[in-house]
């Protein structure tokens, strides 16, 4: 039985004080959650949020990282720096990183391997555009992403990967894939993992849905056979909203 994982991606929002305030409000609201609870603040808030979550059931993720250990990479953060801070997860390959910063699947794969080398669990994002969805190439496109993104891992690493399926057309648009569409695509993703690493590994991989997830949509999504959680955007910025999703 896969344990659900619900992560709040705060994107480029919240000062340090605002981030800590949300965490303090969130802690009592999610203390009895049956799923893994993760918040993903900006780099500048990571340390303060990590300290604020101490002793709680809330885990902390970075929103990105470089794959190199150190060096002349101005503006970047290394996996070793995150590990030293005690960060448990890192979001990799988000569609905004792919679109605005030209991240490739090959670079994402290097980051996935670097995360595991530093005891950080990657949350690997994939998803299609509306044009791809309407052209009927969703499954092929996402398979191409996943086959590169999580290539070359050990079986022990592969089963720990969290995959987030985020249809790009549903991010921040208010549109959402139907629960059937989401489950069908996530099942297709799981079948790609079967091809790569076998059924035993694929059955352990947790696959989230992301894309305008709200408290009023989460229950029906989580009732589906293959949806193991959510990567939440805007609705994770307020403790009340996010706890409503976590406590589905």
UniProtKB/Swiss-Prot annotation:
Active site: 94, 166
EC number, UniProt record: 5.3.1.1
Enzymatic reactions: D-glyceraldehyde 3-phosphate = dihydroxyacetone phosphate
Domain of life of the organism encoding this protein: Bacteria
Function: Involved in the gluconeogenesis. Catalyzes stereospecifically the conversion of dihydroxyacetone phosphate (DHAP) to D-glyceraldehyde-3-phosphate (G3P).
Similarity section: Belongs to the triosephosphate isomerase family.
Localization (cell): Cytoplasm
Pathway where this protein functions: Carbohydrate biosynthesis; gluconeogenesis; Carbohydrate degradation; glycolysis; D-glyceraldehyde 3-phosphate from glycerone phosphate: step 1/1
Quaternary structure (record): Homodimer.
Residues annotated for substrate binding in this entry: 9-11, 172, 212, 233-234
GO CC terms in record: cytosol
Keywords: Cytoplasm, Gluconeogenesis, Glycolysis, Isomerase
Class of this enzyme: isomerase
Protein name as it appears in the record: Triosephosphate isomerase
Gene Ontology biological-process annotations: gluconeogenesis; glyceraldehyde-3-phosphate biosynthetic process; glycerol catabolic process; glycolytic process
SS bond list: none
Entry-linked CDD domains: TIM
GO molecular function: triose-phosphate isomerase activity
SUPFAM superfamilies attached to this UniProt entry: Triosephosphate isomerase (TIM) (SSF51351)
């Amino acid at each position: 039985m896969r344990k659900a994982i619900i992560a709040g991606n705060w994107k480029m929002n919240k000062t340090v004080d605002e981030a800590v305030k949300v965490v303090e409000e969130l802690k009592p609201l999610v203390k009895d959650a049956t799923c893994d609870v993760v918040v993903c603040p900006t780099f500048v808030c990571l340390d303060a949020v990590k300290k604020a979550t101490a002793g709680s059931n809330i885990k902390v993720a970075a929103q990105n990282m470089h794959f190199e250990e150190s060096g002349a990479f101005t503006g970047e953060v290394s996996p070793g720096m995150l590990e030293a801070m005690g960060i448990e997860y890192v979001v990799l390959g988000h569609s905004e990183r792919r679109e605005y910063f030209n991240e490739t699947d090959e670079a994402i794969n290097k980051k996935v391997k670097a995360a595991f080398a530093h005891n950080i669990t990657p949350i690997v994002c994939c998803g299609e555009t509306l044009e791809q969805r309407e052209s009927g190439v969703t499954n092929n496109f996402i398979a191409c992403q996943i086959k590169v993104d999580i290539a070359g891992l050990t079986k022990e690493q592969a089963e720990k990967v969290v995959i987030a399926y985020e249809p790009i057309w549903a991010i921040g648009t208010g549109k959402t894939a139907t629960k059937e569409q989401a489950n069908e695509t996530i099942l297709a993703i799981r079948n790609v993992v079967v091809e790569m690493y076998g059924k035993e590994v694929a059955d352990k991989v947790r696959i989230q849905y992301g894309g305008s997830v709200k408290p009023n949509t989460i229950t029906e999504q989580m009732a589906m056979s293959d949806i193991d959680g959510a990567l939440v955007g805007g609705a994770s910025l307020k403790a009340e909203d996010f706890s409503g999703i976590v406590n589905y």
